[in-house]
């Protein structure tokens, strides 16, 4: 229904962003909303997919058509919902997911929250040979440089909220928090990416 939405990025939250266009604010769920942080209060184009449920109509948004395409593919797999698909794409690029599927790498797939061995096998069964490896869109690898701050700042707190929203448990987050506190991060996006790297390693 909505191929993409173009407008001003007016708000950022751990689970979603708000894009304002023609006086309407669209709430868009994203894999890692802080990747959009460098575009705050600027015009953006977000590739979207509308998911209709009995109790809600939800917009999901992505930085590239490749990422959107992988979300749509994952969402068709039995046992995979939008939340699990977002968690996978928050931690990996579309190409990394495609390579994992083509190589039948169940160990890689089961590192994501909500993905057990049965679901990993189903992903491979349903998608192997059906997704193409394409050149990665550089926008999926964006970094935002913000002001430096210590780890008692909201940066770490916001990053942990974003990881929790992706489905990671308190136990996993406690392990990640200790490791993140040992480093210095200049943005929430950087801290989220570091946390995801720890969680899927």
UniProtKB/Swiss-Prot annotation:
Keywords: Cytoplasm, DNA damage, DNA recombination, DNA repair, DNA-binding. GO terms for biological process: DNA recombination; DNA repair. GO terms for molecular function: ATP binding; four-way junction DNA binding; four-way junction helicase activity. Residues 1-63 are annotated as: Domain I. Gene3D superfamilies: 5' to 3' exonuclease, C-terminal subdomain (1.10.150.20), DNA helicase RuvA subunit, C-terminal domain (1.10.8.10), Nucleic acid-binding proteins (2.40.50.140). One of its GO terms (cellular component) is cytoplasm. Residues 143-153 are annotated as: Flexible linker. InterPro entries: DNA_helicase_Holl-junc_RuvA_I, Hlx-hairpin-Hlx_DNA-bd_motif, NA-bd_OB-fold, RuvA, RuvA_2-like, RuvA_C, RuvA_C_sf. SMART domains: HhH1 (SM00278). Homotetramer. Forms an RuvA(8)-RuvB(12)-Holliday junction (HJ) complex. HJ DNA is sandwiched between 2 RuvA tetramers; dsDNA enters through RuvA and exits via RuvB. An RuvB hexamer assembles on each DNA strand where it exits the tetramer. Each RuvB hexamer is contacted by two RuvA subunits (via domain III) on 2 adjacent RuvB subunits; this complex drives branch migration. In the full resolvosome a probable DNA-RuvA(4)-RuvB(12)-RuvC(2) complex forms which resolves the HJ. The RuvA-RuvB-RuvC complex processes Holliday junction (HJ) DNA during genetic recombination and DNA repair, while the RuvA-RuvB complex plays an important role in the rescue of blocked DNA replication forks via replication fork reversal (RFR). RuvA specifically binds to HJ cruciform DNA, conferring on it an open structure. The RuvB hexamer acts as an ATP-dependent pump, pulling dsDNA into and through the RuvAB complex. HJ branch migration allows RuvC to scan DNA until it finds its consensus sequence, where it cleaves and resolves the cruciform DNA. Has three domains with a flexible linker between the domains II and III and assumes an 'L' shape. Domain III is highly mobile and contacts RuvB. This is Holliday junction branch migration complex subunit RuvA. It comes from Staphylococcus carnosus (strain TM300).
